Amino acid sequence: MYRFLLSRQWVITTLVALLLIPTMIRLGIWQMHRHDERAARNDLVAEALAADPVPVRRLTSPGHTVTTEERYRTVTAKGHFDTDDEVVVRRRTNGNDEIGYHVLTPFVLADGKVLLVNRGWIPSDPASQSAFPEIPAPPRGETTVRGRLMPDETTEASGIKDIEGLPDRQIMLIDSEREAERLDAEVLGGYVVQTAPEPAGGTPQQLGNPGRENAALNLAYAIQWWLFAAGVPIGWIVLVRRESRDRTAAAETDEREPTESEPATV
């Protein structure tokens, strides 16, 4: 009854089914790993945002690489803004996907070391991408700032290419080591996204809290792949039974049909 399974067509179909099952299982396992990674990152971000503010010097220093556990921690610093050496970070968007700049201002601490502060987003001038934009001034004199500690930006992590030959005082990526060379000063590793004090008039537009990654979507994909893997053998069995029924029905029809040597019954 099932000798047809030895035919070329059915051997190929069976081999394809046997290959699909482990492939789909592995894809489901990969999606589960992605789910676990995203869930772990969400937990780290939530813990960092909920932690009490600490002085920035407790978490970073010149040459320090901000770790995953330190990222998004709320820090404070006392000093003054140096707008003479302020730069803007190109091709940054706000919540409405409008393209503009991030304003990066050196913040000089009492001991002369520098903390890079991202004061927020401003729109770019469509008529000129090379002219330095007008930037609202920060508070004058000694100020205490608060914000989220962030690691230096890289092309690998951000997907943003570091273009050379940019107009004066414009950069693509926030890199504390490069800024230390430009400023000829000791710059603390990473930078701070300012959350307080709020700017006068609401500009620069301060950056919102990081969003949660959709880990549940990866879980749904994993379950979907495993259901597909379970469906392959079920589908194979359904096809085999259908083929067997069709062949049996065809054989019974052939048996009922009269041969050429036998007259049909009237």
Model-identified regions with their sequence ranges:
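Surface-exposed, charge/polar-rich loops and edge strands
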Residues: 1-60, 68-266
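Phosphate-centric recognition/catalysis
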Residues: 65
